[in-house]
Amino acid sequence: MKKLFLALLLAGGAVAAQAEEARLLRFPATNGKDVVFTYAGDLYRVPIAGGEATRLTSHVGTEMFARFSPDGQQIAFTAQYDGNTEVYLMPKTGGEPERLTYTATNERDDIGDRMGPNNIVMTWTRDGKNILYRNRISDGFSGKLWSVSVEGDMPEQLPLPEGGFCSYSPDGKKLAYNRVMREFRTWKYYKGGMADD
């Protein structure tokens, strides 16, 4: 009996260790030639045709929501390195990220929060000069769309009441956007039924 218990305990520990190591490929984006995605908190790039993924970042912190520039040469992304979640920019080949935003720390500012992290990169303007991101100013339950220049100038709020994921029309004259942000709501974490055993 003791041997059976010990075997089950060891097997359970091995399964638990494997579960801790399991990580998801998240937040993919493409420029038509490559795909950039987050794995274990770092950014990777892989050819759209397949092949080996290249690790682009290895910083202490988390990178997510990467978006290629219209010319496909730069990547804007959201990262949390020092407690604040901010917008960063780097070449598509990797390198040292350039911080573009400097915002106040929100109490609830992580990927596990039901409202999601702050300063999520949404898209680029068609001319490649600005990056749109969603900011949850004042730690609120609604997000506002902001634009920051790739030169790092002062961000500007778009004249919209609320905003979430968005995309420009091919000519860059119109912006389609979601007013409600629900991508991190707790009901999306549902893992099973409510039926009796």
Over which residues does each language-model region extend?
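Positively charged n-region of N-terminal signal peptides that target proteins for export
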Residues: 1-4
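A flexible loop/linker signature enriched in serine peptidases of the S9 family
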Residues: 19-20, 38-44, 59-63, 78-88, ...
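Beta-propeller domains with acidic blade repeats across secreted/periplasmic ectodomains
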Residues: 55-56
